[in-house]
Regions:
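Active-site regions of metal-assisted phosphoester/phosphodiester hydrolases
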Residues: 1-24, 79-267
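Alpha-helix boundary/capping residues
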Residues: 29, 52-56, 192, 231
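Structured beta-strand-rich core segments of catalytic domains in phosphoester-bond hydrolases
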Residues: 33, 37-118
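N-terminal, active-site-proximal structural segment of metallo-dependent hydrolase catalytic domains
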Residues: 1-52, 67-73, 258
């Protein structure tokens, strides 16, 4: 099975011509399953994939949270294999940011963890507090731990390295959230029961999956895009397709997205 995870950077909308280019890039990679974040709802993107034989989940049937209402974007799954859409975990403030489906014997989730800790003025305006972000991380961990044969990938936002060198953490500004968040991140990224499929690609010398352009530490490397598996019986290879992030159009703008897609191949 070939799974492509990609934040297509559609939170503020994608013009139709660029949507067509992104779909063409996906078709060139030829994944069986596509896990998407920042899908612009009502803009025809999922319908464009459906025209090429991909069944898609329906994120707009879930309740609208404040963030989605503001940005009109969601996480979604598209599959050329038979797929049954499942409900997102209970307790999410933004259920449209967590799409779940069963494909064969595998349960797969596409998630977008709310961006809350690094941009406090924006977070406050949108009703996003660090606690909401931590809760989404907590639900992601509970979902992975809740059944065999589960795989989750998506944009986790705002990465930060632990001082002791463990793979990756996620910054929290409030002390009350920090310890709770790091415990959850340890469960996601550094546990024996969950495999961090792309953690070996996050050395400081490696190409990032996203350049952080704003906030307190702009113009630095970031690995926002992750894949995690709770199935020890299945091996996955992981490769970032950085060329799709670095590709530029004639105006020097990103041709596709400011995130590198992550290709997973299961054996």
């Amino acid at each position: 099975m070939r799974i492509l995870n990609w934040n297509i950077h559609g939170a503020s909308g994608i013009r139709p011509a660029k949507q067509a280019e992104i779909i063409a890039a996906i078709l060139h990679v030829s994944p069986d399953v596509v896990l998407l974040q920042e899908v612009p709802l009502g803009a025809g993107f999922l319908e464009g994939l459906a025209a090429h034989g991909y069944a898609t989940t329906e994120p707009d049937k879930h309740p609208i949270g404040l963030w989605e209402n503001k940005k009109k974007n969601a996480a979604a799954i598209a599959s050329r294999l038979p797929m049954t859409e499942l409900s997102p975990p209970e307790g999410l403030r933004f259920p449209r940011l967590f799409s779940v489906a069963r494909i064969g014997g595998l349960e797969i989730a596409s998630c977008h963890i709310p961006n809350a800790s690094g941009f406090n003025s924006v977070a406050k305006k949108l009703g996003l507090t660090p606690d909401i972000k931590v809760t989404h991380l907590e639900r992601a961990l509970a979902w992975l731990d809740g059944g065999q044969g589960r795989l989750l990938a998506g944009d986790f936002n705002e990465p930060d390295f632990f001082r002791d060198g463990r793979a990756i953490g996620f910054e929290a500004t409030r002390a009350a959230d920090r310890d709770r968040q790091r415990t959850i991140v340890d469960g996601l990224m550094n546990s024996d029961s969950i495999t961090h499929l792309c953690g070996h690609l996050h050395a400081k010398s490696d190409e990032p999956s996203h350049w952080i352009k704003s906030g307190p530490h702009p113009d630095r490397k970031g690995w926002f895009d992750h894949a995690l598996s709770a199935n020890k019986g299945r091996a996955w290879s992981a490769t970032y397709l950085h060329e799709l992030r670095s590709s530029r159009d004639e105006e020097g703008k990103e041709r596709y997205s400011d995130h590198s897609p992550l290709l997973l191949v299961g054996s």
